[in-house]
Amino acid sequence: MSPPTKISYARRPSMVPAYARVLLGRKPYSAPDGTVIEPVELEARKVVLSTSHIQRYREVCAVPASAQGLPPAYLHVLAMPLHMQLFVVKNFPVKVLGLIHLRNTIRVLAPVDERAPLKLRVYFETMRVTDYGQEYDFTTSYEQSGTVVWEEVSTMFARGTSGPKEGSKRPVIERSGHPETGVATDTLEIADNTGWRYARVSGDFNPIHLTARTAQMFGFKQAVAHGMWSMGRCLASAALHIPNMKIQIDTQFKLPVYIPSQALARTWSVAGGADISMCTMKGDRLHLAMQVRTL
């Protein structure tokens, strides 16, 4: 594999030019047979945290006031400008608007000093061909004072391919087998402005999350909640059960969460962390499954 193309910014770039290129670009929805991935690495050398922005995120995801430190999934939204730049570089082979978020792993490695700047790095080098399409991994990391404090791997999916099935089976977080006793439950009210509120905080204005009309253009009957909002909301619901230390959060996204609707967040305290699920109010359909463990 060739060395990565490296692009460096002093600070996080504006997303406006990237959005224009996403909307006007002519990339395919899946990579053609024989596509060779050229790695790319982007960095923002100075990312400054905003107390007001953190508070807005906490409000959108209903993070309780008693939860200490940065919400575990917050730094994902600050990386959105670099994610957008990554999607439009020539090295990335497919159209971002057709991608589906399959899995996410976050590792919270050290407390973040909200008064000190961070260095942000985003990296892409992997495409896997599976039975149903193509999977792409994006690695995001933050350093503070030379120490990696937060890491994330997001796995995205592009439907359809005629190429060889090279992808290995990935570990699956199945529906929880925990008993109904000992479970903490929380009814989540997903209001009709949830998509817009999260978009304004995250900068991710994907049309499928905003209105029923724009979502229908991409095959959805209603707007659907952003997967990272669902994750952040469930982590907020389970905040009292999550250790305030080094943790790893493994999430699998299942069925879409329609806007507006209700959902049920369920949390089981287990040795070294918590198991969390988000499902329909009847409990018969799973929206996401999550495992939080200490490192």
Model-found features: residue ranges?
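HotDog/MaoC-like acyl-thioester-processing domains
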Residues: 1-26, 33-37, 82-84, 102-187, ...
